Amino acid sequence: MWDLNDAPHQTQREEESEEFCYSSPSKRVGSFSNSSSSAVVIEDGSDDDELNRVRPNNPLVTHQFFPEMDSNGGGVASGFPRAHWFGVKFCQSDLATGSSAGKATNVAAAVVEPAQPLKKSRRGPRSRSSQYRGVTFYRRTGRWESHIWDCGKQVYLGGFDTAHAAARAYDRAAIKFRGVEADINFNIDDYDDDLKQMTNLTKEEFVHVLRRQSTGFPRGSSKYRGVTLHKCGRWEARMGQFLGKKYVYLGLFDTEVEAARAYDKAAIKCNGKDAVTNFDPSIYDEELNAESSGNPTTPQDHNLDLSLGNSANSKHKSQDMRLRMNQQQQDSLHSNEVLGLGQTGMLNHTPNSNHQFPGSSNIGSGGGFSLFPAAENHRFDGRASTNQVLTNAAASSGFSPHHHNQIFNSTSTPHQNWLQTNGFQPPLMRPS
């Protein structure tokens, strides 16, 4: 139906504009009405059109007219097709959608996967200086030492040249202390022979076996077993843990080899053929047989010869020193006995206090008389006997009689001075 109010030229213009919109391949009409202002044109950008089109001077600004809403917030997700404004693609929504989906998948997987309980290790922290458990490297000695904890105490197992040997020692001790289920460095099948051996030994005995398999003392400076450098500069040989003692001293030697040989001989005497030695035990057969034939020992004689490997000079020196010490001890005991006898004799002959002094009043019978007539004889007789005994003791101890007289006079001088100071004169001895 024609609208009579419109002009014919306006109707013709509207028809031309409509045909132009439908004829253009790169344009489509989103909505159409009689009013020209209500038409919305959406362009599908193409590469050819973008190259031929003259871009405006103003920069392009992209606005997101339909932001995505979370499903929990009650918003409605946009179901509209993706629009392309002047060839610009909106990829943010895709990234957001993909990331949210990935997060949801990860959360779901984390919820579905059950939490695995962590196995607590009973072995404690690993050593910082070694890859093996129970092994520590000491820079000062340059050796690998093995330790194990038992009842809150750290038990020393020995010092070794390699970390592998120290780890083996730790494994053996761990199996002995904690059983077959103990945490060890290597496979349990490697210790079948050790399992048979440790059944007949206690913990302490097995630890001693491990220590004997190590290379010497933990802080020793010698490569030989039972040998360490003494502070005097010589090499000391000793054997530890023997018959309840901490260690048995074997002597000082000029070289390490001599000290090592002394240790080997002592070990063979104590442990027999099973002893762990530094050298081949067969080289000591002749010496040990000669000693056993010349000086037969009984099983009860466990005392070792302390001068086992010393040289002849040092042996004679030690014997001379022992003789001198014994002689000095005997002399000192003899002199002490003599002095004790002399003191008891002097105490038994003390003067009687009932005698009167000259010039005093007469008490009892008679007047004044000489001071201590009878007691002085006994006292001087005791002094003479004591002097003679002391002279003999001084002669036996190596002192000259003249030297002894000087000592005796010096000891008797204070008594005489006291008598003279107080006005008393020593009594005159009656001629016999």
UniProtKB/Swiss-Prot annotation:
Its annotated compartments are: Nucleus
Query: Which GO MF term does the entry hold, naming one?
Result: transcription cis-regulatory region binding
Key word Cell inner membrane present: no
A Pfam family of the record is: AP2
Lineage: superkingdom: Eukaryota
Which intervals carry biased composition (Low complexity)? 26-41
* UniProt DNA-binding residue ranges: 131-187, 223-280
Q: What is the effect of changing G159E?
A: In AP2-5; temperature-sensitive
Found, by tissue, as follows:
Sepals, petals, stamens, carpels, developing ovules, inflorescence stem, leaf and stem.
Q: Give the UniProt entry's GO cellular component terms.
A: nucleus
Q: Give the GO terms filed under biological process for this record.
A: cell differentiation; flower development; meristem maintenance; plant ovule development; seed development; specification of floral organ identity
According to the record, the residues making up region (Disordered) are 1-56, 287-362, 395-432
Quote the biased-composition stretches of kind Polar residues, using this chain's numbering: 290-301, 325-335, 345-358, 406-424
CDD domains, alphabetically?
AP2
Where's it mainly located? nucleus
- InterPro entries referenced in this protein's UniProt entry, alphabetically: AP2/ERF_dom, AP2/ERF_dom_sf, DNA-bd_dom_sf
UniProt family annotation: Belongs to the AP2/ERF transcription factor family. AP2 subfamily.
Other comments on record = Mutations in the APETALA2 gene result in the ectopic expression of AGAMOUS, leading to the replacement of sepals by carpels and stamens and of petals by stamens.
**What exactly does this protein do?**
Probable transcriptional activator that promotes early floral meristem identity. Is required subsequently for the transition of an inflorescence meristem into a floral meristem. Plays a central role in the specification of floral identity, particularly for the normal development of sepals and petals in the wild-type flower, by spatially controlling the expression domains of multiple floral organ identity genes. Acts as A class cadastral protein by repressing the C class floral homeotic gene AGAMOUS in association with other repressors like LEUNIG and SEUSS.
Quote the subunit structure annotation.
May form homodimer. Interacts with HDA19 and with TPL in an EAR-motif dependent manner.
**Protein name (database record):** Floral homeotic protein APETALA 2
Organism field: Arabidopsis thaliana
Name of the coding gene? AP2
